[in-house]
A protein has these predicted regions:
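Class I S-adenosyl-L-methionine-dependent methyltransferase catalytic core
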Residues: 1-164
Length: 164
């Protein structure tokens, strides 16, 4: 997998990625057949893993030019172009126009602080939040699972609207 040089992109480690997908599998195999969003996609590791595990389609949103170039190469080299949409745009500007998703991966830079507005704008059944700290889960979301892996905290949240 191509990863752009520098510190702007922090790919999810293999260990954390495996743990995330095991957790999603335990939640009624949430990825299989789902429409997936990889927001702040970077190299696309999470969305590409979702495609390899049977996601119907993945929309990748990445604003960084170098990361978007690497992501496009990764999509092509793995043969997922037919089930992938890549948009080079700021995630916060794109999200209000987004369709609903089954699963959304949210892995912004660790300094990101706009979680409440990001989750408020997101329309998804499940969201996987990756950060260096626990985030406060907004009222319309319920915490399903939280785990720490070294410096990384992964929270899986479910839209309370999906339970109605």
């Amino acid at each position: 997998m191509v990863v752009p040089a520098g510190t702007d992109v922090r790919p999810t480690s293999d260990r954390v990625r495996e743990a995330i997908f095991n957790a999603l599998y335990s939640l009624d195999d949430a990825v299989a057949g789902a429409t997936v969003l990889d927001l702040f996609a970077g190299s696309g590791a999470l969305g590409l893993e979702a495609l390899s595990r049977g996601a119907a389609a993945v929309t990748f949103i990445e604003n960084n030019r170098e990361a978007a170039t690497a992501l496009a190469a990764n999509i092509e080299s793995l043969g997922f172009a037919d089930r992938s949409t890549m948009i080079r745009m700021d995630a916060r500007r794109w999200l209000p126009t987004a369709p609903p998703f089954g699963v959304a991966f949210l892995d912004p830079p660790y300094a990101f602080a706009e979680w409440d507005s990001l989750l408020s704008a997101l329309s998804a059944t499940l969201a996987v939040v990756e950060s260096n700290r626990s985030i406060a889960v907004p009222p319309r979301w319920g915490l399903v699972r939280e785990r720490r892996y070294g410096a990384t905290v992964v929270q899986i949240v479910r839209s309370l609207a999906s339970l109605e």
